[in-house]
Amino acid sequence: MQFTNHMHQRMSQRGCTKSMVAFTLSEGSIRGDKYILNRKTTQKYLSYIDNKIKNLRWRLQEKNQTSYQEILNELHELQKSRRIALKILDKGGITVVLDGEDLITTYNINSFKRC
C-alpha cells in the first residue's frame, strides 16, 4: 500500500496513525473502495481481545515454562492491538479510502454528522 501526500496530511489533521490505518485495513469491512471500522465492530473486537487476554493470563498462572515466553509475546501483541482499537473507538470509528494500491484519505466515521 502506498500512502499519498493527501493521506499523510489528512492523517495528521484528524489524529490517525499508521497503526490505526493498518488496523482498519485488516479488521474493517469493505464497502466499495472504502474500509470501514465502525464503533460496533470495534467493540466486538475489543471483547474478543479481552477474552483472549484473560485466557492467556490464566495460562501464565499454570507455570508451564516451555510456552511461557510465547504466551508473553502473544499477550504483548494483543495488548498493542487493544490499545489501537481503543483509540479507534474513541474516534467513533475510522474510514480509509483506497484507489487500487494507493491510500487516498482517512476520516472519522462521525465526521459527516452535523447538528
Feature annotation, model-predicted:
Residues M1-C115:
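Ribonuclease/tRNase effector modules and their secretory precursors
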